[in-house]
């Protein structure tokens, strides 16, 4: 679609250095939620121009791209001016004129494969079940409330097909039981992973992205979780 194409064109300007293209895609009052950058279109253009002059070229490799209403959500591997590969989720909101007006993101350093040999970005990419977009959104909203926010942890098994859970988190192996074991191990060290507020739940077909706020080991944390849903159960997970 046009929105998807525009979002992918925008992130590609980090590699191409095409500041004119970036300018044409962005609303003048572009709202930036990445805390490392200034807000507004000019700040974005400044970043593109800065990267264009860097001695090492920036690379942008999009892995997954989805659309939900006026928002596009992407999973992408960036390497900004040779600083090292980062895995990112980007969310872009479009205004009524079709310009990109707002952006949220979360990035993590690219890590070695996890205990099950999976990376932060490999696994299923096929988009399907477009007729189940809202059903799957509700499933993830309920899961975030019941399980991640801890209101009804006893319901956890209802969200999974037995122990089947393909896991791309850098520190956890496949299986629902492995997630439980990892959280127990953290708790023994006095480390809690707490989800307090869910800000956005974006959905297209069998993929749903939850954007949440909480704490990890007492530090304020943004949690971006991408889940793949299969037959009404959570089947696969990527996160930053």
What are the roles of these predicted feature ranges?
Residues 1-240:
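C-terminal and inter-domain tail/linker signature
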